[in-house]
């Protein structure tokens, strides 16, 4: 299946920004602790924990650090008293946006999220307002590789789809609970992915122009700056021409 590099570029940009802010490890550790507390410390029996471990390893977190986080969760660490909250809304240009948070204070979190929307010309919506536009999937990414080899191994392991982008990058899509199993099968076949994460994939896209694209990027930046925000998903699509002006 052919694709475009826009989505890969957006994801890589996001990862670079998180790393620059020094927040990504803090957010991953919080997810590891929470996942272990809610579902136990065995990743084979806890898909959420397995997904968090895959994300930690993709971001070069050491095994020692992630194991300590899991132990904190299993041990009932006070810091694990977090709840997952999903907010939905509309951004510039009618972009559908989903925000995944981990918080111990709903009032604080919703105030920060609402502030970001109000500053950037968006609107915080009600539950279900945009969720129907997204599907939860596992995404295993290769910056480069042989499409036929990866596709054959991935589909044999139970992947749902394989997308090749214009820049040579390849994404393998799976049911989110099966991502760890598929990644293990790919590695057993000698195919080591550059990253693996659970994501919300939009079914439709909203084209961003030179006016709306900067506003959308500002909104995403503000949301990602919130300590309680774990992930921001959107269906905005920015062309290479517009991206070059940002």
UniProtKB/Swiss-Prot annotation:
InterPro entries: Integrase-like_N (IPR017856), TACO1_YebC-like_2nd/3rd_dom (IPR048300), TACO1_YebC_N (IPR049083), Transcrip_reg_TACO1-like (IPR002876), Transcrip_reg_TACO1-like_dom3 (IPR026564), YebC-like (IPR029072). One of its GO terms (cellular component) is cytosol. Belongs to the TACO1 family. Gene3D superfamilies: 1.10.10.200, 3.30.70.980. One of its GO terms (biological process) is regulation of DNA-templated transcription. It is found in: Cytoplasm. Residues 1-20 are annotated as: Disordered. HAMAP family: Transcrip_reg_TACO1. This is Probable transcriptional regulatory protein YebC. It comes from Escherichia coli O6:H1 (strain CFT073 / ATCC 700928 / UPEC). It comes from the Bacteria. GO terms for molecular function: DNA binding.
């Amino acid at each position: 299946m052919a694709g475009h590099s826009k989505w890969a570029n957006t994801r890589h940009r996001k990862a670079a920004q998180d790393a620059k802010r020094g927040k990504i490890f803090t957010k991953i550790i919080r997810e590891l602790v929470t996942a272990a507390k809610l579902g136990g410390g065995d990743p084979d029996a806890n898909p959420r924990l397995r997904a968090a471990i895959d994300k930690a390893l993709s971001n070069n977190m050491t095994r020692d650090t992630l194991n300590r986080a899991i132990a904190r969760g299993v041990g009932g660490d006070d810091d694990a008293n977090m709840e997952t909250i999903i907010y939905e809304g509309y951004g510039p240009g009618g972009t559908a946006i989903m925000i995944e948070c981990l918080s111990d204070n709903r009032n604080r979190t919703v105030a920060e999220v609402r502030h970001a929307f109000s500053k950037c010309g968006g609107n915080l919506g009600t539950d279900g307002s945009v969720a129907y536009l997204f599907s939860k999937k596992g995404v295993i990414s290769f910056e480069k590789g042989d499409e036929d080899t990866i596709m054959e191994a991935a589909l044999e392991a139970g992947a749902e789809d394989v997308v090749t982008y214009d820049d040579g990058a390849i994404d393998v899509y799976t049911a989110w609970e099966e991502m760890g199993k598929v990644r293990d099968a790919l590695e057993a076949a000698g195919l080591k992915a550059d990253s693996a994460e659970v994501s919300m994939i939009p079914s439709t896209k909203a084209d961003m122009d030179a006016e709306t694209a900067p506003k959308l990027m500002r909104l995403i930046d503000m949301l990602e700056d919130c300590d309680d925000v774990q992930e921001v998903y959107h269906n905005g699509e920015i062309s290479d021409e517009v991206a070059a002006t940002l």
